[in-house]
């Protein structure tokens, strides 16, 4: 059962055009505009990576990106995750912003804790550089 009516934990993801973007990557262009171009160019998965960034700024960017994904008619086909910031992903979902989950690193919050906060329907991505990390 979903904690959030808009969330969708998919059985499979198309990672063929996984697009990672944040304000630090766009040379002053609006992140949402860059995401719009990426979607029109065939992006299949969106990750907001805003470093550095405070919760309010990341939430605002996430709201804009989620709207762009919806405006492109891809809310059900293109997952949207936030990098590292489980707190922001939780806040977005609480506010009704369609964020599908997070991508966290080995030194971030434990994936089990992220799952507990975001629910069973959330995507929890985890960076892994070693086979042992995948098996852990």
Whereabouts are the PLM-identified features?
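Conserved N-terminal beta1-alpha1 strand-loop-helix module at the mouth
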Residues: 1-107, 117-131
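Short, charged, surface-exposed secondary-structure boundary motifs
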Residues: 110-118, 135-136
């Amino acid at each position: 059962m979903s904690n959030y009516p808009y969330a969708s934990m998919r059985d499979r993801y198309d990672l063929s055009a996984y697009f990672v973007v944040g304000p630090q990557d766009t040379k002053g262009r609006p992140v949402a505009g860059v995401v719009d171009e990426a979607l029109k160019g065939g992006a299949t998965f969106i990750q907001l990576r805003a470093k550095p960034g405070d919760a309010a700024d990341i939430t605002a960017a996430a709201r804009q990106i989620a709207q762009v994904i919806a405006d492109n008619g891809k809310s059900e086909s293109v997952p949207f995750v936030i990098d590292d910031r489980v707190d922001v992903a939780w806040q977005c979902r609480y506010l009704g912003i369609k964020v599908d989950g997070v991508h966290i690193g080995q030194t971030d919050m434990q994936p089990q804790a992220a799952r507990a906060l975001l629910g069973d329907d959330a995507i929890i991505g985890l960076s892994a550089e070693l086979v042992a990390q995948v098996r852990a």
